[in-house]
Amino acid sequence: MNIYIQQIHSLCLQNKYTNWYVKIIENAINRQEIIGYSETHHILPKCFRLGGDHDLENLVDLTAKEHFICHMLLVKMVGDNQMKSKLAYANWQMTMRSNGRDRYKICAQQYEFLRKQLSKF
């Protein structure tokens, strides 16, 4: 098993969101390749400050949808409020404009969730 997935298991809450996150990451690691557009994701987020920022084993290529979902899941995987705020902010930034157009379109429910998370901090 990937060492960064092991760290996720030991650092994060043991809940369905962590299980879903790990499953997405494991599927991406085992996938041959993504046809078309992909985004590189840190399995163990940089904001955890536990290293691995430049380790290729901590990087995985995800589809845009998988990447956005993983960032939504990360917010629900941690109990520490400071870490939760960093992850919520990173997720919020993914919805911001990039090159003059929306990077991701989110539904009202996702918008409400992110705004509530950010308002707590």
For the regions a language model picked out, list residue spans one by one.
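Core of folded catalytic or high-affinity ligand/protein-binding domains
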Residues: 71-74, 92, 100, 107
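Histidine-centered nuclease catalytic patch
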Residues: 28-62
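Residues that form generic nucleotide/phosphate-binding pockets
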Residues: 11, 27, 73, 94, ...
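N-terminal accessory alpha/beta regions
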Residues: 79-99
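Secondary-structure boundary/linker elements at domain or insertion junctions
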Residues: 96-121
